[in-house]
Amino acid sequence: MGAAAAEAPLRLPAAPPLAFCCYTSVLLLFAFSLPGSRASNQPPGGGGGSGGDCPGGKGKSINCSELNVRESDVRVCDESSCKYGGVCKEDGDGLKCACQFQCHTNYIPVCGSNGDTYQNECFLRRAACKHQKEITVIARGPCYSDNGSGSGEGEEEGSGAEVHRKHSKCGPCKYKAECDEDAENVGCVCNIDCSGYSFNPVCASDGSSYNNPCFVREASCIKQEQIDIRHLGHCTDTDDTSLLGKKDDGLQYRPDVKDASDQREDVYIGNHMPCPENLNGYCIHGKCEFIYSTQKASCRCESGYTGQHCEKTDFSILYVVPSRQKLTHVLIAAIIGAVQIAIIVAIVMCITRKCPKNNRGRRQKQNLGHFTSDTSSRMV
C-alpha cells in the first residue's frame, strides 16, 4: 500500500472553465472601452495631440496649444508686471520680480501718497516695488505734523487724509502703541508682553533701571517718548549727568525730524553716533556712543564690564538665566547628551570586560596544550 501510494502521480488542480475565461476577457475589454478610461489615458487638455481642440464652453472649442501659450504668458516677468525699480530674476523654472534696494538706515522720514510714513525715501521706493503700486512723496517729514509714529514699510491704507481721520480720536500713537477707540477713555494702548524675557538689567536714557531691554520699549510706548538704552547693568548716580550740556535756552535739545539745512548723514533720531574727539578715553572697557536725541554720551561696555565708564567688573554675566522657551531646548539637549554619554560608557565597559576574558581563554588553552604534551611524554 505504501509503495502504491508513493508511485501514484501527482494531480494538478483543475484548470478554470473556458466560459469563465471568456467572461473575464469580455469584462476587461468592456472596462477599457468606457469613455472614462479613455479620458484618463489622454493627456491633460484633451485631444491627445498637439493640435487637438479643447472644450471652450457653450459648444465652442479652442486650440490646446494656444491655451498653453496663454497660460505661460501669465507667468512671464516683463516691464509691465515688474515696475517701480523691480528686476526680473530666475527663480527655479520661472521668473520673479525682485526688489533689490540697499537702503541706508538714516532716519529722514517722508510721507507717502498712501498715508504711511517711511524711514527715508529709499524705503518708500522699495515699498512701491514690493506691492507694485505707485507711491510718491507728498511731504518731507512724517505724515503727521506732530511726528506720528510712521512705518518703515507699512501697508496701504488709503490717502494721508483718510489715515489722519482714522486716528484723529487718539492722535498719533508712537513706539508700537495702538489706538483703542472702543474704550471709554480713547487713547493709545501698549500691548507689549515682556513676560518671556530673562533678567538682564539695563540702564536707560531716562535715568531708570529696567529688568531687561523689553521693559525699556514698554516704558517708551507707555510714556510716548524716546527712551534709549545707555549700558548694561543698573544705573549709577552719575548716569543722569549730561556731558555735552544744553542749548542756550536751557531746554534739552530733542529734535524730532532732521533739519533740511543739516546735510550730515550721521544726524538722525534714535541712533548712536561716534563720540567727539574730546571724549576719547571716556569708556575704559567699551565703546563711546553719542545719543543725538538726548545730547548725551554713553558707553557700550564689553562683555564682563559695567558702570558708566565700563570700569566695573560684572560677574553676573557669568550666570545667564535662559527664558522659558529656551529652557526646554536646554533640557532636551542635556537629556540627549546624557544618553549619548551613557551609550559611549556602556560600549567602553563592554569592550574592557570582554578583552580580559579572551586573554584568559587563550592562556587556559595554552596551559592545557602544555599539560597534554607533558602527560603524553610521561605515558610513553
From Swiss-Prot:
Tissue distribution of the protein: Expressed predominantly in brain, and at lower levels in heart, placenta and skeletal muscle. Down-regulated in brain tumors as compared to control brain tissues.
Residue spans, topological domain Cytoplasmic: 352-380
Highest taxon above the source species: Eukaryota
Domain annotation Kazal-like: ranges: 98-145, 189-237
Biased composition (Polar residues): 366-380
Annotated EGF-like domain residues: 271-311
Entry keyword set: Cell membrane, Developmental protein, Disease variant, Disulfide bond, EGF-like domain, Membrane, Repeat, Signal, Transmembrane, Transmembrane helix
TM ranges: 331-351
Segments on the Extracellular face: 40-330
Family, per entry: Belongs to the tomoregulin family.
Disease linked to the protein: Encephalopathy, acute, infection-induced, herpes-specific (IIAE). A rare complication of human herpesvirus 1 (HHV-1) infection, occurring in only a small minority of HHV-1 infected individuals. It is characterized by hemorrhagic necrosis of parts of the temporal and frontal lobes. Onset is over several days and involves fever, headache, seizures, stupor, and often coma, frequently with a fatal outcome. Disease susceptibility is associated with variants affecting the gene represented in this entry.
Protein name: Tomoregulin-1
Organism: Homo sapiens (Human)
Phylogenetic lineage: Eukaryota, Metazoa, Chordata, Craniata, Vertebrata
